[in-house]
Amino acid sequence: ATVGLVLGKLFFIDRLLSKCADHLSLLAAPATLERAYDFGAEAFDGIFDALRATMPCVVLDVPHQWNGWTQRTLVSADDILIVATPDLANLRNAKNLFDYLRTARLNDHRPFYMLNQVGVPKRPEIKPADFAKALEDEPVAVIPFDPQLFGSAANNGQMIAEVSANHRNAETFLQLAKLLTGRSEVKKAKSGLLTPLLGKLMKK
């Protein structure tokens, strides 16, 4: 019965996923606007349970919204990486998330966070050091603004490593993947974009 249940979950998940590479499959959001998608807090529990039972690693790109299912997903996640841009609104939202998740996840280590699109020309920004002071924690990565690299990847439907395997951002993403999957000790990136993380995995 157990074997049949696992095979059933595998078949179910295989029908939902789109294979992108040997080690990457995507579960995409609906592409049509014919109906409204208002999800309840437990709407994705079945899918998440099936993914956890059949996949070695599940990464969820949770949308920038706060409702029942996003709250439930974050609280039950093994690890959380908050992605923020260096402005006041993102600092406020990240601070609120940090404060809530530290309380809601007492037995788990605190969320990680990274800064994205840093260094946009002529845009006032909050410095990474000021971000770190407000959140009482260092970012695990700081990604510089690079419209050509990220624009090419987005328009071609490619990952950063596929566009430029030797780019410093590709190395940063590799180190982030190692951190979040716990597969190896994270080292400081050559470009200096990834902060030292020795001992951070066990930090509460």
Language-model features and meaning:
Residues 91-110:
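Conserved C-terminal guanine-recognition region of P-loop GTPase G domains, centered on the G4
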Residues 77-96:
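Conserved Switch II/interswitch segment of TRAFAC-class P-loop GTPases
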Residues 157-204:
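NTP-binding/hydrolysis catalytic cores, primarily Walker-type P-loop NTPases
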Residues 84-85, 111-123, 142-148, 165:
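G-domain G4 guanine-recognition motif of GTPases
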Residues 118, 132-160, 173:
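Beta-strand-loop-alpha "switch" segments that mediate conformational coupling across diverse proteins
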Residues 1-26, 141:
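Phosphate-binding loop that captures ATP/GTP phosphates
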Residues 27-70:
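Phosphate-binding/switch loop-helix module in NTP-utilizing enzymes
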